[in-house]
Curated annotation (Swiss-Prot):
Binds 1 divalent metal cation per subunit. Keywords: Isoprene biosynthesis, Lyase, Metal-binding. A divalent metal cation binds at residues 9, 11, 43. It comes from the Bacteria. Belongs to the IspF family. GO terms for biological process: isopentenyl diphosphate biosynthetic process, methylerythritol 4-phosphate pathway; terpenoid biosynthetic process. This is 2-C-methyl-D-erythritol 2,4-cyclodiphosphate synthase. One of its GO terms (molecular function) is 2-C-methyl-D-erythritol 2,4-cyclodiphosphate synthase activity.
Amino acid sequence: MFKVGFGFDVHRFSEDRKLILGGVEIPFEKGLLGHSDADVLIHAIIDAILGAMGENDIGRLFPDTDMKYKDISSIVLLKEVSKLLKNKGMSIINIDTTIVAQKPKISPYTDEMKTNIAKALNIEKTQVNIKGKTTEGLGFEGREEGVSAYAIVLLHE
């Protein structure tokens, strides 16, 4: 059986944080505000995987009220979700994602992001796709207030 999951996440920019996307620290004057490292791409992927498995969302699995997740790398959380996936006897066919940000440009970092995600999930890099988009100056991303990410995953059970 095949199962599809969809994920979305958004975080606002913050002056005193690093910008982490797909487990890659991207040089930029602002980072994203959040309880963990606020990696919107990984969070969207986690929610997509959890959705396809019929599990709770990222906020219930890794609540921001639990201090053990404070500033944690989202790659660590993704590895935990990978274990759940394996325990359920499911495997990833492919992941397709979109990062929406006016700035910074994402394309120079997507290859390293794919590598990080594939390694965390124990899949091939060719099973992960990442696209960067702007909103042509529209919306909160266009006003450079934050970043959003969308992910869809196809699982096989």
